[in-house]
Amino acid sequence: EKTEQNILQGIDFVKRSKGRWLLGNIYPYVEELTRKLQDSSLIQRAVAAGSIRRMKETVGDVDILVTTSKPEKAIEYFLSLVSYEKIWGKGVTYVSVHTNEGFDVDLRVLPEEVFGAGLQYFTGSKEHNVRLRAYAVRKGYTLNEYGLFKGKKRIACKTEKEVYEALGCSYIEPELREDQGEIEKSIAGKLPSVIPYGSLRGDLQIQTDWTD
């Protein structure tokens, strides 16, 4: 019975993960790419966003945000680092490629002064962002990748913490931004603590043939 349940759960996982990559397989690639971007004199900051930053078990594509005073040169440098089959789109502050490894990588250039707002916008799941923007509207604001606005006046943009707190929320860790009640809990001051990666010391469960 337990084996049957495990098989059914595995089938469900495969269906949900179709067209996606296991985090453990794609993370080293992203880590190396962001390090090379960060090491360039062209780029001030390079951070992976999206499901990579949320540490989802599977990843559909890769989003990387950078700040630079030379967007076009930074984009060309990025293209020199990746092996790609196709460029899906390219602009002054954006490029999207399909890599030879089989997944898409999007690079977005953001102004330094709004990097926090952009990082918040491109990190959360679609559902988290929709709910947060709707909450902002109810409070009389507009929220996008360039900041939190009251009419035409920008209220918050420099850091993610600043954006959340301006909305009356406590800071929500990236791993929690899945629209599973985290916004409501942050407003109420009841967000659960996230175990820091440095606190992990080993595997707490070992599977054997006897567990089936």
Residue locations for each model-derived region?
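Short hydrophobic beta-strand that contains or immediately precedes a catalytic carboxylate
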Residues: 48, 203-206
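Helical scaffold of the NTase/Pol beta-like nucleotidyltransferase catalytic core
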Residues: 1-47
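Histidine-centered divalent metal-coordination motifs
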Residues: 63-65, 205-209
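Active-site nucleotide-donor binding segment shared across nucleotidyl transfer reactions
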Residues: 31-71
